[in-house]
A protein has these predicted regions:
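Unchanged
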Residues: 58-144
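N-terminal strand-loop-strand
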Residues: 8-54, 59, 81-86, 105-109
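Short glycine/proline-enriched turns and hinge-like loops at secondary-structure junctions
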Residues: 6-7, 24-25, 97-98, 117
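Context-gated lysine
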Residues: 6, 23, 81-83, 89, ...
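Nudix hydrolase/Nudix homology domain
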Residues: 3, 48-52, 117-166
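Cys/His-rich microdomains that often coordinate metals
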Residues: 1-3, 20
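Short amphipathic alpha-helical patches
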Residues: 18, 40, 97-98, 154-155
Length: 166
């Protein structure tokens, strides 16, 4: 029977000393821009209960870098290529074992979307003026959208009067 470690977040076998650490599943989320436009999508109802506008996201596969994951997920979900991938920040998801790593990227080539219909119900390009303000800034996806729309989180807070809850 494994026991809690006294020094770190892990389980330890008292007999052999084997240490087991929590499983963490890295995933990427990316805000893809084309000038003043941002790519946003909506999930299929049966895949995800979230009904708002989402960014392209997906889990990192074994042996894959974050950048490779972004290229693969963007191609799979919307049939597009991206360039100039830039790290933004990361966020642990409290309700799962996921560590979400956020990025910005730019469209590389034609903007014609080829939707992965078994995962997404729609995707489109939205001018920064068309992006709805977030009512709850509780996710890295919300932050990425507002940073694109306003240029920075500070500008978003200044313009909207929203107060950071962190």
């Amino acid at each position: 029977l494994m026991e809690n470690s006294k020094t770190e977040r892990a389980l330890v076998c008292p007999e052999c000393g084997q240490t087991e650490y929590p499983k963490i599943s890295p995933a990427v989320i990316v805000a893809i821009s084309d000038g003043d436009r941002l790519l946003m999508s909506r999930y299929r109802v049966n895949n995800n209960p979230y009904r708002g506008y989402a960014l392209i996201a997906g889990f990192v596969e074994i042996g894959e870098s974050f950048e490779e994951t972004i290229h693969r997920e963007v191609m799979e979900e919307v049939g597009l290529k991206v360039k100039n991938i830039r790290y933004y920040k990361s966020q642990p998801w409290a309700f799962s074992d996921t560590e979400m790593i956020g990025f910005f990227a730019e469209l590389d080539g034609p903007d014609k979307i080829k939707l992965q219909e078994d995962e997404l119900s729609e995707a489109g390009w939205y001018h920064r003026d068309e992006i709805p303000d977030e009512t709850m800034m509780n996710s890295i996806g919300s932050e990425l959208k507002m940073v694109f729309k306003y240029g920075s989180l500070e500008k978003f807070y200044e313009v909207t009067g929203y107060k950071d809850q962190n």
